[in-house]
């Protein structure tokens, strides 16, 4: 089972993503934490050491790309964004995929 955290400032987007992951992946992913800011997300990720991070590109205190650079670990990163034009930039910083928010 993969351990995952969600770093997303929009509560509804966090809830929808958690529902999708928990309801449709037959216990393959366990959500072990969630955060609504980049700083708190960095601290959580470095403490819990997840396998996967679902990371919003635009957070209230920093960009998701800066969160990625500040991590002490190298988990799989899946960026979430409302703008598909961030996809190329996401792949440039070694994310494995991205989700356009509409989930």
Q: Model regions: which residues?
A:
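Non-catalytic signal-transmission and effector/linker regions of two-component phosphorelay proteins
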Residues: 1-3
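Conserved acidic carboxylate
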Residues: 8
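Detector for Asparagine
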Residues: 26-27, 39, 46
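Acidic phosphotransfer microenvironment of two-component signaling modules
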Residues: 11, 36-42
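Two-component/phosphorelay signaling modules centered on CheY-like receiver
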Residues: 11-33
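ABC ATP-binding cassette signature C-motif
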Residues: 35-36, 48
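CheY-like receiver
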Residues: 42-103
